[in-house]
Amino acid sequence: IENGELVHKAGYGLANMELGIPLDGSHVHRMASVSKQFTAMAVHLLAEEGKIDLDEDVRVYLPELLEYEGTVTINSMLGHVSGMADYDQIDGDSTERNPGLNIQSAAGGPFRLGNEDYLSIEEFYDVVKQVPLKRLPNQQYEYSNLAYFLLSMLVEEVSGQSLRRY
């Protein structure tokens, strides 16, 4: 991309080795945890702009979250010490859209991104914001995709833009 215009789009190698399908510029790939660096950068930009305080309780910016036992700071979320669980540690939540949806696994369990169980960002946020802490904040390191998802919601709330646009 140069000056906002796509100047090169290509793929190299194979999209499917078994079938010999070449990779081209139209294939979509899951970024997984690579996106965390963009979320963290956006959070730090907001702090640099004076719009958030990294040592403040996240509920100052996302008041609809549960009232946690202990203060969950933005810094604790960035450093994976917030006490928040991860996708596979959420007990049987469901949504009105799909009352049978049981979010227990992001890979191969009942909750699978991108298929018929797909939740919109808003629907997923409605589930995640009701998840209690697994443990008190700042007690133990535990990798948490949920914390980073909530940080992306914080960026959108505070900036008034999508994470991508911000």
Predicted feature residues:
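Short hydrophobic alpha-helical segments used for membrane anchoring or interfacial signaling
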Residues: 1-3
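Active-site-proximal loop and beta-strand segments within enzyme catalytic domains
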Residues: 8, 12-144, 159-161
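Well-ordered alpha-helical scaffold segments within catalytic/enzyme domains
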Residues: 152-157
